[in-house]
């Protein structure tokens, strides 16, 4: 069924609003992926705070004009999925990377972060970013390790000092 002008304007406005609040965006080609797998991907995306949109290419180009993701416009060829990360910059990249591993026909075309276009081959730049909680845990582990190391070195120095004074 053909979309009317008002419907198209509403879709462009929705995608534009999603793009304005998103931290990063990933563009993928869904040709050859079954409907059941796509529905599972959508459910997983909702659970992870990723806004997944299947939009006509012309409407997607118009929706992304004036946003940080306008650099993705050249990728809109064929059946295109737009995935916006709302909570963590690497969420959409990680989600689609895992989905692409399980589905050979699913192809990631590229992504954008803070207005910078990133090739699909460099997907790991964003997909491997730790979440806020993971980064805090890594920082705490490093700090704890440093403190424990200082304590061990201090105790060893005291032991050496006592051995020297006893000798």
Curated annotation (Swiss-Prot):
Part of the ribosomal stalk of the 50S ribosomal subunit. The N-terminus interacts with L11 and the large rRNA to form the base of the stalk. The C-terminus forms an elongated spine to which L12 dimers bind in a sequential fashion forming a multimeric L10(L12)X complex. CDD domains: Ribosomal_L10. Forms part of the ribosomal stalk, playing a central role in the interaction of the ribosome with GTP-bound translation factors. Belongs to the universal ribosomal protein uL10 family. This is Large ribosomal subunit protein uL10. InterPro entries: Ribosomal_uL10 (IPR001790), Ribosomal_uL10-like_sf (IPR043141), Ribosomal_uL10_bac (IPR022973), Ribosomal_uL10_bac_type (IPR047865), Ribosomal_uL10_CS_bac (IPR002363). Keywords: Ribonucleoprotein, Ribosomal protein, RNA-binding, rRNA-binding. HAMAP family: Ribosomal_uL10. One of its GO terms (molecular function) is large ribosomal subunit rRNA binding. GO terms for biological process: translation. NCBIfam families: PRK00099.1-1. GO terms for cellular component: large ribosomal subunit. The lineage of its organism: Bacteria, Pseudomonadati, Pseudomonadota, Gammaproteobacteria, Alteromonadales.
């Amino acid at each position: 069924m053909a979309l009317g002008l008002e419907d198209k304007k509403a879709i462009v406005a929705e995608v534009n609003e999603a793009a304005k609040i998103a931290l990063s965006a990933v563009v993928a080609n869904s040709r050859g992926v079954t409907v059941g797998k796509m529905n599972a991907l959508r459910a997983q995306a909702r659970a992870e705070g990723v806004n997944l949109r299947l939009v006509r290419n012309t409407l997607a180009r118009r929706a992304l004009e004036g946003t940080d993701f306008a650099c993705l416009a050249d990728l809109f060829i064929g059946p295109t999925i737009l995935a916006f990360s709302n909570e963590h910059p690497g969420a959409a990249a990680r989600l689609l990377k895992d989905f692409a591993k399980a589905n050979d026909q699913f192809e990631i075309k590229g992504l954008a972060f803070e207005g910078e276009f990133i090739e699909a081959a460099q997907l790991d730049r964003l997909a491997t970013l730790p979440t806020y909680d993971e980064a805090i845990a890594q920082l705490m582990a490093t700090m704890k390790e440093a403190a424990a190391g200082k304590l061990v070195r201090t105790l060893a120095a005291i032991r050496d000092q006592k051995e020297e004074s006893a000798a």
